[in-house]
């Protein structure tokens, strides 16, 4: 069913409703209209990295870990599995007449905000700091969720529109002031791609204001940009209780009727919250019109018809057996493999069980199930922590010693105990062992969303990039033993790894790797698979390198604009192979405003088969509006066997050659560019870390 047909059906159904019934359907918990055969429906459903908050489901790596795969095809597979399980659960729930929250088909995912500052607590819900990477992965995820069937498999929702990335503590009152250049160059491209390429069915507005307008009541964002400029035809939903913020915290309206008016006039069709309960009162006061209410109602029912809720769907027979089936769980572990980023390796990895008799596993995240999943997660029927994964891997080959070592953030583990009461046990463990794996980091309670956190007053954000003091002291104590140490970090954002970089033998960034992430960590540590993830964010040296958190200017932010050297750059990640782009050329002569095709040779001179990510960055040499450094404009994941060379081809979109000026206008402003082809960025730090130079291709348009 195409949109025109679905809208026609929606118009016919809405025409049979009273105005009161139409207004009632604009709330997230829409009531039944029994006389028309319309069941109750709850629009609030989550599927960030698996069907969330609805019981059992496959728990994939957190979004930031999926982003580290740099793999559009894998991302679409993951989303298709999520949609499959979402349909299966919806089918089963519907047969039981269970239409509660989190049990529907309208999923408020993906989060395609830009992770501009590593202190933002919700950054791990995103695909990182780069607008191009975020756009490509967002489109893949949306296509995977929505499918290409006669009806929509599930409905995706791109959030949070727009310019939304902390601080969490003041998100209900904050005004994100941003230049037109930064708006159109950094904050909007992923949403534009979601609409124009992904065909996303819904868009969610953010809590904050953007340049003075509340996002859920912004005519600039919702009318001009979203609908008029981009041609969006789906529905817009508010973030939860965001419309209430208009009068309660932003103080820009005098009460709920005016807030409902502002949101509805701007084109916010659906209210997650209770403010649209005042729509009828606003109608009686002449603040809104019947036409506005009717149009919003038609839009939300168009979505329901596209999903086949009234006429049936080819997905109605998806059985419950697909939920967390073996095939889906295997895909989740595969995704964790691909997303893990090896930041340092002095040759200690992969570990050889034949040469090791004792292994120490210490740290607060070594046996922490919570740290596997990140936020917005489902419930797995089985979890494998890092400790459990290592124990299973070595079985009878090695003795595994375990010590928790420290609390996640408290100085003591037991009441009345001395400070650092578990560190001595970790030291004893390290002394017993040939190698010690220290598993540090955070979890969803330490970084995340404002109402859900317990991280000592930061409302989900991080005060700094440092590990909590107890964890840092633990690491230093284990290192002081003088035996080999491997650092494994479970976190959703960049941490301060300067000490680990100098003093430990290897560092593996494992993100929040999913329910069975411990299996994936063990597979990487012991060489069952080669790590091949790439950083979707910059690992800064410390917070002194960062601008103020509330400053939304891109100056000195992210790899495209940063002025100092990174500890670990965006796009960086080692493998067990030794892979480089050994040659690159244009497949055909580049022409202005046409796709540019690059053919390159990728060579693995190492001893291990591995996957690798070929990356292309563009540098504009002439325009004064160009980004300070360079920008990602293409990537492709490839597999290269030891001693092998392969050829691959990447296509660079003409948009890569454009700039955005101070008025927010995008156009080609130069005829001289460089394209850098490598397995990392073309910056000096990446070259030093990998030992490989990027291949430069010059483009000069006539």
Where are these predicted regions, by residue range?
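Glycoside hydrolase catalytic-domain context in secreted enzymes
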Residues: 1-663, 669-681, 702
């Amino acid at each position: 069913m195409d949109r025109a047909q679905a809208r026609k059906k929606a118009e016919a159904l809405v025409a049979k409703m009273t105005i009161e019934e139409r207004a009632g359907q604009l709330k997230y918990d829409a009531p039944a209209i029994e006389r028309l055969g319309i069941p109750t429906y709850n629009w609030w459903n989550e599927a960030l990295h698996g069907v969330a908050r609805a019981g059992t489901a496959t728990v994939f790596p957190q979004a930031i870990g999926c982003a580290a795969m740099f793999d559009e095809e894998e991302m679409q597979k993951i989303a298709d599995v999520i949609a499959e399980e979402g349909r299966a659960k919806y089918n089963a729930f519907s047969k039981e007449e269970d239409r509660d929250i989190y049990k529907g088909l309208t999923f408020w995912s993906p989060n395609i905000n830009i992770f501009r500052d590593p202190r933002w607590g919700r950054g791990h819900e995103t695909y990182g700091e780069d607008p191009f990477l975020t756009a490509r992965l967002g489109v893949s995820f949306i296509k995977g969720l929505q499918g290409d069937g006669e009806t929509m498999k599930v409905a995706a929702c791109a959030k949070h529109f727009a310019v939304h990335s902390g601080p969490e503590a003041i998100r209900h009152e904050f005004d994100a002031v941003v230049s037109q250049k930064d708006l159109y160059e950094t904050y909007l491209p992923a949403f534009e791609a979601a609409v124009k390429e992904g065909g996303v069915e819904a868009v969610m507005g953010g809590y904050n204001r953007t340049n003075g307008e509340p996002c859920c009541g912004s005519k600039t964002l919702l009318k001009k940009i979203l609908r008029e400029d981009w041609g969006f035809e789906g529905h817009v939903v508010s973030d939860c209780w965001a419309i209430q913020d208009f009068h309660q915290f932003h103080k820009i309206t005098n009460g709920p009727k005016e807030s409902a008016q502002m949101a509805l006039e701007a084109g916010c069709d659906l209210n997650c919250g209770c403010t649209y309960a005042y729509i009828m009162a606003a109608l009686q006061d002449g603040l809104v019109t019947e036409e506005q209410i009717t149009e919003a109602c038609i839009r939300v029912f168009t979505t329901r018809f596209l999903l086949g809720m009234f006429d049936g769907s080819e997905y109605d027979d998806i059985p419950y057996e697909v939920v967390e089936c073996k095939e889906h769980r295997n895909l989740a572990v595969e995704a964790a493999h691909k997303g893990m980023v090896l930041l340092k390796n002095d040759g200690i990895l992969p570990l050889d069980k034949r040469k090791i008799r004792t292994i120490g596993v210490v740290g607060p995240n070594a046996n922490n199930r919570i740290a596997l999943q990140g936020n917005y997660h489902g419930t797995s029927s089985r979890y494998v922590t890092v400790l459990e994964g290592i124990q299973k891997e070595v079985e009878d080959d090695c003795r595994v010693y375990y010590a928790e070592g420290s609390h996640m953030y408290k100085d003591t583990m037991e009441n009345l105990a001395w400070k650092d009461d578990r560190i001595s046990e970790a030291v004893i463990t390290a002394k017993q062992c040939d190698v010690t794996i220290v598993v540090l980091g955070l979890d969803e309670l330490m970084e995340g969303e404002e109402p859900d956190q317990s991280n000592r007053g930061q409302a989900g954000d991080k005060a700094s990039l440092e590990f909590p003091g107890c964890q840092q002291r633990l690491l230093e104590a284990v290192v002081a033993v003088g035996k080999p140490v491997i650092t494994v970090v479970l976190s959703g954002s960049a941490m301060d790894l300067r000490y680990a970089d100098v003093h430990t033998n290897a560092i593996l960034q494992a993100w929040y790797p999913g329910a069975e992430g411990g299996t994936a960590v063990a597979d990487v540590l012991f060489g069952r698979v080669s790590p091949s993830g790439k950083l979707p964010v910059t690992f800064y040296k410390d917070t002194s390198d960062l601008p103020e958190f509330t400053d939304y200017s891109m100056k000195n932010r992210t790899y495209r604009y940063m002025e100092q050297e990174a500890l670990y750059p965006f796009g960086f990640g080692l493998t067990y192979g030794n892979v480089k782009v050994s040659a690159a050329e244009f497949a055909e002569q580049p022409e202005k405003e046409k796709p540019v095709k690059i053919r390159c040779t990728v060579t693995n001179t190492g001893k291990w088969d591995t996957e690798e990510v070929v990356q292309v960055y563009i540098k504009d040499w002439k325009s004064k509006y160009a980004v300070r450094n360079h920008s990602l404009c293409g990537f492709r994941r490839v597999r290269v066997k030891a001693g092998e060379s392969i050829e691959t081809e990447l296509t660079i979109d003409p948009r890569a050659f454009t700039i955005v000026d101070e008025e927010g206008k995008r156009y080609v402003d130069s005829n001289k560019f460089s394209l850098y082809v490598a397995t990392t960025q073309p910056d000096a730090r990446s070259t030093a870390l990998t030992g490989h130079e990027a291949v430069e291709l010059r483009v000069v348009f006539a």
